Amino acid sequence: MPALGCCVDAAVSPPPGYSFLWDSSLPAPEIFPSGVPPSTNTAVATTTTTHWSPAHSSALYSIDGWGAPYFTVNSSGDISVKPHGTDTLPHQEIDLLKVVKKASDPKNLGGLGLQFPLVVRFPDILKNRLESLQSVFDYAVQSQGYEAHYQGVYPVKCNQDRFVVEDIVKFGSGFRFGLEAGSKPELLLAMSCLCKGSHEGLLVCNGFKDAEYISLALVARKLMLNTVIVLEQEEELDLVIDISKKMAVRPVIGLRAKLRTKHSGHFGSTSGEKGKFGLTTTQIVRVVKKLEESGMLDCLQLLHFHIGSQIPSTALLADGVGEAAQIYCELVRLGAGMKYIDCGGGLGIDYDGTKSCDSDCSVGYGLQEYASTVVQAVRFVCDRKNVKHPVICSESGRAIVSHHSVLIFEAVSSTTTRSQELSSVDLQSFVEKLNDDARADYRNLSAAAIRGEYDTCVLYADQLKQRCVEQFKDGDLDIEQLAAVDGICDFVSKAIGASDPVRTYHVNLSIFTSVPDFWAIDQLFPIVPIHKLDERPVVRGILSDLTCDSDGKIDKFIGGESSLPLHELGSNGGGGGDGGKYYLGMFLGGAYEEALGGLHNLFGGPSVLRVSQSDSPHSFAVTCAVPGPSCADVLRAMQHEPELMFETLKHRAEEFVHNDDEQEEDKGLAFASLASSLAQSFNNMPYLVTNSSCCLTAAANNGGYYYCNDENIVGVGAESAAAEEELWPYCVA
């Protein structure tokens, strides 16, 4: 322990803002006679005196990096959505806070009464992503003189939501966009949707297969769907040959090759020679020979490979595509009827806006560089081998759907750092009860403060706290005295300009349900307040969810941060303005998160809102609103029977009321009230209700769905809506 101030001249005046009690013989201290000492952190001091604008928030949260071209901050300090990307006109931008208010306001105020958490989908962004992907490949094909075309395939595992898949088929029908399935239910889904799509769109059948899966894929072929059965295992070939002959269907076969090329990040584990999927070169040769012996070598038409999701650089991409193109050319040489090369997934998303090649959260390229690299690598190998250029496919699901949905949730409360205030008498009494070592720490803390040795103050404060904790464990200090120690240590940290403690913001969310990849693989997503961005965030915090699990928190953020800049909550939670609410948004989570979410603590999925750009006063129309699963829904998912549970509880309530000493009329009212309360609990979502006036069961009168045909969006809200109180346009069936 540093020998500081064991004997200090009492005449030495303390620094501004300090006065510590030495012992009971000294006069009572003054608390903050002249304010706290100036912070030694000049950067913080400078920042706190500057004007804050939406541009500052945009830079602070890197919104222009990860959000471009779909998300920005408007002049009101709200997140603004550009549904058509760079082609969005100023009057077409959608204020996300207004969408949230439309969703959550009570129905009698023109809202939909939906409960949080809430996923907001923007099909216009989905359309723009598809068109952008097709456009960059079309440009690469044309500019490089490539003699075939590109046609994409959407892997439905990324997001199997009905409207998402149907939108992709509809938006992509003009350029032969197809679907990929990896299981029997996904195959059924894809078959049904592609009946309304392009007849040239591919139906790629991946995943492990049994006889039923293969039979179903061949049925799809009979239904004139452009179906390709991709061999993941060598053993699947025998089933394909046998069943296709029995069904008298000539199959189109693909095979997945295990490449030597792989990347070292988390998502590269499915690639390389030891990857989970695909055939080795030895197995490929055997497959070719068996097909030739069966007179079906012409059926082999597609080569599939997958370097891994989130390919970090175009150099690695070119290496992998070049290797696959060599295999493709060898299959042509061996007599296969090759037509397609399927690059699989890998087109990455820049989650943190850094355009870095060294992180799973970013990639060092854009759409155009990706497309140009793929086309160039295939063309180079095929030209050298004098092989006809194949149709290029990719399964870029993450790149297609990540941007189109935003998860919105509320911060309902936060931990406070308010210290216990002690009078001079209480402080003297506290010091007298300390043991000798703790009292020495307190005196040394006082001396260090008087000398202005602020770093040493922190050291002695920590030692004092630890010794007092030990005294408390031994029963020598009571809980009020331990709280006083915490108060003194907090006082020291604040007074000397030490960094403010990180607060915990409690959010109305389940990490396990809505952000499972953060819990499972530390995947980071940009999280930002969707409003108040014209105000300076004054605290830093981590996010803690509703589950009874220590893993139910988000304490890592993009940019390598362990906390997030946040705004102060009001005394009752929320953000003070905007009706006292404080809303946060998680962006770029449109791929995988909904499909992977579980039911930990029986918290179900979020409410869902589908929003399209329109010519209405607020620039949007709600085309579909679905309340999240109720308590009854999640109980039913775990094999409980909510109806029987309700009857059991209602019977118990009836017994309770019957045995109560009330008038018969009052008993009837009491029973009705209890039964109604129980029914409401089953019908409500499992999450917190932060506004008792809102309608929690938005589906009560309409079976759970608000919807309209997309054609009806055109012209919706054409009526005058100048007044802010006027109902925002939406369609309700």
UniProtKB/Swiss-Prot annotation:
Q: Where along the chain is the transit peptide annotated?
A: 1-44
Family annotation (SUPFAM superfamilies): PLP-binding barrel
According to UniProt, the name of this protein is Arginine decarboxylase 1A, chloroplastic
Name of the gene encoding the protein in the UniProt record: ADC1A
| Enzymatic reactions | L-arginine + H(+) = agmatine + CO2
Q: Which domain of life is it from?
A: Eukaryota
Q: How does it assemble?
A: Interacts, via its C-terminal internal region, with the tobacco mosaic virus (TMV) replicase helicase region.
Active site at: C548 (proton donor)
Localization in the cell: Plastid, Chloroplast
- Listed GO cellular component terms? chloroplast
Cross-referenced InterPro entries? Ala_racemase/Decarboxylase_C, Arg_decrbxlase, De-COase2_CS, De-COase2_N, De-COase2_pyr-phos_BS, Orn/DAP/Arg_de-COase, PLP-binding_barrel
Q: Which Gene3D superfamilies match?
A: 1.20.58.930, Alanine racemase, Lyase, Ornithine Decarboxylase, Chain A, domain 1
Q: What is the role of this chain?
A: Involved in the biosynthesis of pyridine alkaloid natural products, leading mainly to the production of anabasine, anatabine, nicotine and nornicotine, effective deterrents against herbivores with antiparasitic and pesticide properties (neurotoxins); nornicotine serves as the precursor in the synthesis of the carcinogen compound N'-nitrosonornicotine (NNN). Required for the biosynthesis of putrescine. Catalyzes the first step of polyamine (PA) biosynthesis to produce putrescine from arginine.
Q: Which cofactor does this sequence's record say it needs?
A: Mg(2+); pyridoxal 5'-phosphate
Q: What is its EC number?
A: 4.1.1.19
Q: Which residues bind pyridoxal 5'-phosphate?
A: S309, G346, E395, S396, G397, R398, Y592
